[in-house]
């Protein structure tokens, strides 16, 4: 379960992972933003994927913000593979990536009420909550972890 760098040929698999998590974890309206991110930022922003038996089943990135922080972005696991340790492996790899950069003093993320507990288990604390911030029924839970 070691992440590898995203390749442009992974786009279809990553969009399929996104689609498998709609509408509980992502709002349908977010798909265009994710697709645009994959086309424009995934390669230069060190986006990562995890493969199982040659199939991409998880993906996520780390966005360097330039203000002493880095942000976990677009982290997701194919819905049928939740609770198998893939999300944790991906999150830990991105945390190690951030911790290795001396310019990063804190890691931020925007998640939902559905995954807030997962990130709390990795040392993140809630900064604020915006009701329906990611879409109807999907609160934006802003979290951070100070290094």
Regions found by a protein language model. Give the residues of each.
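Helix-loop element at the rim of GNAT/NAT acetyltransferase active sites that forms part
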Residues: 15-29
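Conserved catalytic-core motifs of GNAT/GCN5-like acyltransferases
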Residues: 108-110, 120, 125-142
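Conserved acetyl-CoA-binding loop-helix of GNAT-fold acetyltransferases
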Residues: 77, 83-96, 121
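Active-site rim helix/loop that mediates acceptor-substrate recognition in acyltransferases
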Residues: 26-48, 52, 56, 61
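A short beta-loop-alpha structural element at the N-terminal edge
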Residues: 1-14
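Conserved GNAT acetyl-CoA-binding A-motif
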Residues: 91, 98-112
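Conserved acetyl-CoA binding element of GNAT-fold acetyltransferases
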Residues: 68-80
């Amino acid at each position: 379960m070691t992440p590898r760098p995203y390749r442009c040929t992974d786009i279809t698999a990553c969009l399929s992972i996104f689609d498998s998590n709609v509408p509980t974890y992502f709002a349908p309206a977010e798909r265009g933003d994710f697709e645009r991110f994959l086309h424009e930022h995934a390669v230069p922003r060190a986006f990562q994927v995890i493969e199982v038996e040659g199939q991409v089943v998880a993906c996520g990135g780390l966005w360097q913000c330039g203000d002493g922080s880095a942000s976990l972005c677009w982290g997701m696991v194919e819905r049928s593979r939740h609770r198998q340790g893939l999300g944790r492996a991906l999150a830990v790899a991105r945390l190690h990536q951030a911790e290795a950069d001396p310019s990063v003093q804190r890691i931020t993320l925007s998640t939902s009420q559905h995954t807030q507990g997962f990130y709390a288990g990795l040392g993140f604390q809630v900064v604020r909550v915006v009701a329906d911030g990611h879409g109807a029924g999907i609160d934006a839970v802003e979290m951070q972890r100070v290094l």
